[in-house]
A protein has these predicted regions:
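RNA/tRNA-interacting regions in translation and RNA-turnover enzymes
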Residues: 1-232
Length: 232
């Protein structure tokens, strides 16, 4: 897997005076192979056994650990997140989850959102890592995934029929049209989510369904964060 990490984004978490070429050199000695640094962006090859570094924070953590081994001062800037309190009302969604496939399933309803263009700094960072900016809601979820390494997906809540989500394995030849407009005939055994009408709305861990996408008419967003069993 190849990822791109802008140096200015990395410095949000990596406190070091090391030049980008030093960071690249010593990182390559510890696991992630930095193929090149171009326009202050690291092009990194991540092996399948080191997906923990497939994010800005992951690379910063690795650099903070390896640079001092070569006499270069570096430390990891702790992640500070605000404590958010929710209403505790979960009646907005009925969720049926196969926990053998997905040990942890979290969903939060955010009402009365305003869909608009993201600020320039956010669009610039997404563009630098190869992600096309779409709108503020979709861009935020992509930003979190690239910064922290936690996949996040947003659904248009009002498009989820029956306010119900069932996470299960797909059946052979079930079909789903994903966000890129492509229709897939599934081989069976994929992790999918269906809504209360039995429609597939997400190919879990891969791409969301076109039929539940956030667009300019979205008013209520379901923020969806999940942890899958790696064996699946």
């Amino acid at each position: 897997m190849d990822i791109k990490i802008p140096d200015n984004w990395l410095r949000d978490f990596l406190r070091s005076k090391a030049a980008s070429n030093e960071v690249a050199k010593y990182l390559s000695l510890s696991g992630p192979s930095v193929e090149k640094v171009e326009n202050s962006v690291y092009f990194i090859e991540v092996t399948t056994n080191r997906v923990d570094i497939a994010s800005v924070l992951g690379v910063a953590r690795e650099a903070a650990a390896i640079l001092p081994q070569f006499g270069v001062k570096a430390r990891l800037q702790p992640v500070k997140l605000p404590l958010l309190r929710f209403s505790g009302d979960v009646s907005y969604l009925e969720a049926q989850v196969n926990h053998a496939l997905c040990p942890r399933f979290s969903a939060v309803l955010i009402k009365n959102v305003q869909i608009k263009e993201s600020p320039e700094w956010l669009k610039a960072r997404l563009t630098a890592v190869g992600v096309r900016p779409i709108n503020n809601i979709v861009d935020i979820s992509n930003y979190v995934m690239h910064e922290l390494g936690q996949p996040v997906h947003t659904f248009d809540y009002d498009k989820i029929k029956g306010a119900k989500m069932v996470l299960r394995e797909s059946k052979k030849k079930e079909k789903l049209t994903t966000l890129d407009g492509k229709t897939h005939s599934l081989p069976g055994g994929d992790i999918v989510i269906e809504d209360g009408a039995g429609r597939l709305i997400d190919l879990a861990g891969i791409m969301g369904g076109e039929n539940s996408a956030v667009d300019e008419g979205t008013k209520n967003v379901l923020l969806f964060v999940q942890t899958y069993n790696p064996q699946n």
